[in-house]
Regions:
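C-terminal helix-rich "cap/oligomerization" subdomain common to oxidoreductases
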Residues: 42, 109-151
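Active-site loop of classical SDR/Rossmann-like NAD(P)-dependent oxidoreductases
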Residues: 96-108, 124
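Contiguous beta-strand/loop segments that form the cofactor/metal-binding neighborhood of enzyme cores
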Residues: 3-78, 97, 108-116, 150
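A generic structural signal for residues located within well-ordered alpha-helices
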Residues: 1-4, 105, 128
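Short beta-strand-to-turn element immediately C-terminal to the catalytic PLP-Schiff-base lysine
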Residues: 64, 84-85
Length: 151
């Protein structure tokens, strides 16, 4: 369930990962129902991700730094981005054009690629997709989550 959170972390912090830690609560059917993932980067930065199907979270992405922080409202379907200084003073606010489902940007990018004869999107190249799949696979392995076709 954590693909959007993982992608958000990699988009903003990159992929120079030193290690990951995680904990999970599996559902009765054996899939991840709730998880916490901590990504430790080689340069000392850290991303902490939480995901759950049991309750509705705020879906915010918050990036903290020494001089302030950035809040992205709804990382699945961004609505706005707010930039604050270290005293919580709002410095910038950007509203994102409203979408119906949040998938419009994916459809628009696919349509653009088709029109231009591209087989790979610059915004989400295959190597990033494979990297995210490998991270998800390593988390599933650590949690003991095995898909039926993997047995």
């Amino acid at each position: 369930i954590g693909i959007y959170g993982l992608n958000f972390a990699l988009m903003h912090f990159g992929d120079d990962i030193a290690r990951m830690e995680s904990s999970v609560q599996l559902t009765d059917t054996g899939v991840d129902g709730m998880e916490t993932i901590t990504i430790h980067y080689r340069d000392g930065r850290m991303a902490v991700l939480t995901h759950s199907i049991y309750c509705r979270g705020d879906r915010k992405g918050i990036i903290h730094g020494e001089k302030g922080y950035i809040v992205v409202e709804n990382i699945n379907n961004p609505q706005s981005v707010s930039v604050y200084d270290a005293t919580d003073k709002l410095l910038q606010y950007h509203e994102v054009p409203r979408q119906i489902s949040g998938y419009e940007y994916e459809f628009q990018e696919a349509a653009r690629c088709i029109r231009e004869g591209k087989t790979e999107a610059d915004s989400m190249p295959w190597d990033r997709t494979i990297q995210l799949m490998e991270i998800m696979d390593s988390l599933r392995k650590a949690w003991g989550v095995i898909y039926p076709q993997e047995r």
